[in-house]
């Protein structure tokens, strides 16, 4: 059977626990939203096949736990990322204030070759809560923060209502492509999982 070659782009979603990282990922990939909150343990990822400018590529979206005790997992998961998405809850000042910590954490752990130009995207989520009346972080304040960090693209979303989720991820995909650190993924029509129990090196010298 013939095989296909695709470009693999790795995207990392970071932010405090409970800001809606998993919901954003599920809304984009599966067009689904669940009101039942379940904290991500460690990290999880979903993939979506996307076509852009006559190119077929696979977007691999990593959803990492927001709890500090899991930040030590960062090196393995952050390395090789093509774009980093910083998410906060517009109804939580703390989650917004922590964006800088998450950005710095990523740059330290991922150690990109060109940190000044590495693509970030910021998402202010949960704009649907209480009809927007409970928000405590203004769009103006968020955009000012993004401008100060090198004009980071900014989106306000509702994972629950699907507002601006598609638009945000379109920009994420485009920025990931521009990063230039693309990996070619060889995808055969059948996948041999017979040796899946054998450990694989992450390249980390521990």
UniProtKB/Swiss-Prot annotation:
InterPro entries: P-loop_NTPase (IPR027417), Small_GTP-bd (IPR005225), Small_GTPase (IPR001806). GTP binds at residues 15-22, 63-67, 125-128. It is found in: Cell membrane. GO terms for cellular component: plasma membrane; vacuolar membrane. A lipid is attached at residues 204, 206 (S-geranylgeranyl cysteine). Protein transport. Probably involved in vesicular traffic. This is Ras-related protein Rab7. It comes from Pisum sativum (Garden pea).
């Amino acid at each position: 059977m013939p095989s296909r070659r695709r470009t693999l782009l790795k995207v990392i979603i970071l932010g405090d626990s409970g800001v809606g990282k998993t919901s954003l990922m599920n809304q984009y990939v599966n067009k689904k939203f669940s009101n039942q909150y379940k904290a991500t343990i460690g990290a999880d990822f979903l993939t979506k096949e996307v076509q852009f400018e006559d190119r077929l590529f696979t977007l691999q979206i990593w959803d990492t736990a927001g709890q500090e005790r899991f930040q030590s997992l960062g090196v393995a998961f952050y390395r090789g990322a093509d774009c980093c998405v910083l998410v906060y809850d517009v109804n939580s000042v703390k989650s917004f204030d922590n964006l800088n910590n998450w950005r710095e954490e990523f740059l330290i752990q991922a150690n990109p070759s060109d940190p000044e130009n590495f693509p970030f995207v910021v998402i202010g989520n949960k704009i649907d809560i209480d009809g927007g009346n409970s928000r405590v972080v203004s769009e103006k304040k968020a955009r000012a923060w993004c401008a100060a960090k090198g004009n980071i693209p900014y989106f306000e979303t509702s994972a629950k209502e699907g507002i601006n989720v598609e638009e945000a991820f379109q920009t994420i995909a485009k920025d990931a492509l521009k990063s230039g650190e693309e990996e070619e993924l060889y995808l055969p029509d059948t996948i041999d999982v017979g040796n899946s129990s054998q450990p694989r090196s992450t390249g980390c010298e521990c």
